[in-house]
Amino acid sequence: MIELSNVHKSFGSKQILRGVDLNVARGESLVIIGGSGTGKSVTLKCVLGLIMPDQGVIKVDGEDVTQTGDRDAFLAKFGMLFQGGALFDSIPVWQNVAFRLLRGTLKRPRSEAREIAIEKLRRVGLSPDVADQLPAELSGGMQKRVGLARAIAADPEIIFFDEPTTGLDPIMAGVINDLIREIVVEMGATAMTITHDMTSVRAISDTVAMLHGGKIRWSGPVTEMDSGEDPYLQQFITGSADGPIETLR
Amino acid sequence: MNPGVITRPLAVLGRASLGALAGLGRLVIFALATVRHMVTPPFYSREFMSALLNVGYLSLPVVGLTAFFTGGALALQIYSGGARFSAEAVVPQIVAIGMVRELGPVLVGLMIAARVTASVAAEIATMKVTEQIDALVTLSTHPMKYLTVPRVLAGLLTVPLLVGIGDIIGIYGGWLVSTQSLGFNPASYMQNTVNFLQPIDVLSSLAKGAVFGFIATLMGCYYGMQSGRGAQGVGAATKSSVVAAAILILAANFLLTQAFFSI
């Protein structure tokens, strides 16, 4: 469903992606792991068309993302949970969740959009009481849940999760991991997650790809990850300071 | 002699010039894109109403107070200056022309630059830093249509009204000072003011307001969208937006004054 071939991206003289090749099948949950600054977020943003790759081809459902005719329809396939939530501060929680349903091609009547928002909030474990609060009034964990509710509000085919557990305590991280897994299975959505939290990887993924040096260093089913012989992968999953990955970056 | 001694300063000058021209080009492209998005759907009416409130209505107190004190001070200055050649009687006329043609629009423009440009730039820059702009795009919403167009349109429409109100309050400030402490007759002061002002004075004032409103809100949006990372990026964007808006407003004021009143 999502294909990346030989994707390159540089910012000024800094080369971030140096030929990324990746395939994600429909309904698959892929987790991209890798150290900070290895280009995980850039990869996701290239698929969404937020950043244009310098070279290479990215296809979603066989359609080149740089040549989508109807951008609105293309983006309607996606839901995204941002690292910091990226909730809109100036509008209440329910309008954040129902943002896509209040405007554009998926516009619904306001009362219906609110009902859907409350249902999605309930799905991520939040009570309807939070619907009228502003995002700044919520804790970090609740903001992540609202972000998750917004990502699934329009029942997207593809969901991206950018560091879904960063900044959360271990229990809340576990709750978010379980929610992501349940929701992805329940919706039958294709999921791409980027993280360096190995607990998330084991909880969320069907397949794992490790990004290092601007390329996919290793990829395979999560069940084969621990037995993978790649020294970079082993150093990453064991969190060892000794190994081929430079610790000073 | 080392040829670098001559070429190095030229290279520095060249780089600075190219950088400035590139910046100007980006700003012009941004302004043209804003105008294009203003006339093509979709339009976000709720955001526009909210911008009308923030840019227009909530700026009334600062505009009113600025105009009132300026009008009063202007009356005192003209009276004491005019006394040097026995021309104290021209206070109503000079206050009127000074407020309507120059001080009203310029001071309102600068106050809007301080209040609105800064807040728009800080808000949009923070949205950029916290990935809210990226989130807008993933939610099929064009950031220029959702953030820039409502604010710039609100600036274009409400700042002329603010200038009109500022002109009236400024004249009132001058009237109050003149009648309470300078011994002018209230009715004849007002009569002189109304008789002296011509339609072109008011028209130029409102036209300046529209241009200054466009500049002030556009600069806030432009620098907000161009913001760098982190708190430093937001601070730099806010500072640059206010400086650019103030300078452009003063430059535009000169050009508009020349266009309206050059003989």
Language-model features: where?
Chain B
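Hydrophobic positions within alpha-helical transmembrane segments of bacterial inner-membrane proteins
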Residues: 68, 72, 110, 114-115, ...
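Active-site cofactor/substrate anionic-group-binding motifs, chiefly glycine-
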Residues: 51-107
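Membrane-interfacial helix-loop-helix connectors in multipass membrane proteins
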Residues: 77-100, 165-210, 214, 218-240, ...
